[in-house]
Amino acid sequence: GRVEPEEIVKLYIEKGYDGIVVTDHYSPMTFEPNWCPQKQIDFYLSGYRRMKAEAEKSGKDFTVLLGMELRHYGTANDYLIYGIDEGFLYSAGNLMKPWEKKMYSLCHSKGFLVFQAHPFRTGIRRCDEHYIDGIEIYNGKTNEKLNKKAEVWARESGKLMCSGSDFHTKAHTARGG
């Protein structure tokens, strides 16, 4: 992102939020190619850890939860994963390798939820709905028409629904609902 993690916590507290789920990108573009898995996870968790520390320091009742926006190799699709923890990340290996069916099975074996993020953006393909629990029906950086299409798909398929700001700059603050 383009905003320091500590500043993100302050922005959301100012907007009256009680918490945030940090779903940083975990994709082939996130890491240097020569990084070992340990270094990748340390890097991936750094923003979350800084946000969690800032929330504790603030003295406010503000919860910071760990999530993930996962992209597999060779695709533009993004998947939001809720419920993950640090131990899982260090033990799971390279999460960009397993595709939808295998990833869904792995996540469900741990009690995590998998949502397709912004499914109607250009370049994204709608995934097999058997391998997701839900659909992001509102994305703060996606136009209203495409968000509405996502909501219709979620309702028709009986999937859970979520909303996100897709925070990358201060202008995206609190745009997720």
Q: Model-derived features: where do they sit?
A:
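Active-site-proximal loop/helix segments of hydrolase catalytic cores
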Residues: 2, 110, 115-127, 143-145
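Short, intrinsically disordered, charge-balanced linker/junction segments flanking boundaries
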Residues: 174-177
